[in-house]
Amino acid sequence: MGNSITDNWALMDSVFFAEHRFVGRGISGQTSAEMLVRFRQDVIGLSPEAVVIMAGTNDLAQNNGYIALENILGNIASMCELAKLHKIRPILCSVLPAYRFGWRQEVPAADRIIELNGMIERYARENGISYVDYHSALKDGRNGLPEKYSGDGVHPNPECYKIMEAIVLPVIDKKPAKKVAVRTGGAKKHSWDR
């Protein structure tokens, strides 16, 4: 689930998506609020085992006007809650590094991306959700996406997507630990202890 970064990924490396039976649900220019609106149709309706959510770039670029970081996180959290409610494992991704947004040069990017990523990572940790940190692996000295990985400083090229694939696959393949009820010392503390 994502924006043009997800959409382009499915187009540029369709073999990766086909080999792993992944479905790309990216729409160019979309914000987290717009992704949330289509989450039922594009994710829940497909009944996947997991959903990888990469959202926030277009919110930070102010495609639909200014939005507080807390509201972006709220939209992302709502997608996670919907996924969990439908027995779909959410996986959250960092926003990719960007020094500036080519279509919105006046909007500061790098520092707000870092701040939002911290919020996303904290939310994931506090809620037992896997977090994929693309930002740390891809950033340059200005906290942007290096030229060798992007023609415009925002959208990955095929080489960058290969790096992202190597980062996300182990997280997708890692199954969460199952919760197991353990009886200790014969104490009866739960309804199943009769």
Q: What are the residue ranges of the model-derived segments?
A:
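Charged helix-capping and loop-helix junction motifs
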Residues: 68-77, 110-116
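Cell-envelope and extracellular/periplasmic
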Residues: 25-28, 55-56, 60, 64
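Conserved, well-ordered alpha-helix/loop/beta-strand core segments that scaffold catalytic motifs
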Residues: 51-56, 73-80, 84-93
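Loop/turn elements at helix/coil->beta-strand transitions in domains of secreted/extracellular proteins
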Residues: 19-21, 46-51, 84-91, 127-130
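Sec-exported extracytoplasmic/periplasmic mature domains
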Residues: 40, 44, 56, 81-88, ...
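Catalytic His-Asp segment of secreted/periplasmic serine-dependent ester chemistry enzymes
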Residues: 96-194
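Amphipathic, non-transmembrane alpha-helical secondary structure
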Residues: 33-44, 70-77, 81, 162, ...
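Serine-esterase "nucleophile elbow" of acetyl-processing enzymes
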Residues: 1-50, 162
